[in-house]
Amino acid sequence: MFLLVQNPGVAPVEGFTLLGVSTTRDCGVEGAIGQFGSGNKHAINVLLRAGLKIIVYCGKTRLDFQTRDDEIDDGLIRKPVKRVMCKLGGTSTRTIDLGWVLDFGAIDWTELGMSLREFVSNAIDRTLRQENGEFIPAMLDGRLAVVPVCDEKVKAKDGYTRVYVELNAGVQRYVDDLPK
């Protein structure tokens, strides 16, 4: 099972893979939240540290996040690190080294709810921008959605951004606490 966070409109792949990219900052839409270009990246790391699978579809492009063991040598010690990687599928098949390690954000991005709130906030931001400052109609008709889905429902939807987070007890608690 996965939690699906879906919004109309296709986020750029770089919004999940390039630190500092924010399409919401200075967008001119009242109520938009995002601005720093780091939230998605921190959210991905929280989930990877928790051992949860995350799959993102930016339209038809699939993003699978994983880590690769590496070692940093500063001349005094050799420190093992886990580099965060993104394997693309669909419209591209390359693997991107994202340029940060799993410990990025580990001191202050510590809870599953923080990562889930980030994805939901980004979905609302995009919907606000896509729908001329309104998100309630998209929520009511299902274009903007935060719902559990079974594994076989994990797939792309043209014209949409879809974030799938592996469902565990912590993710389910977050879903249960959402306003109905």
Language model: regions and residue ranges:
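GHKL (Bergerat-fold) ATPase N-terminal catalytic module, capturing the glycine-rich phosphate-binding loop
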Residues: 1-180
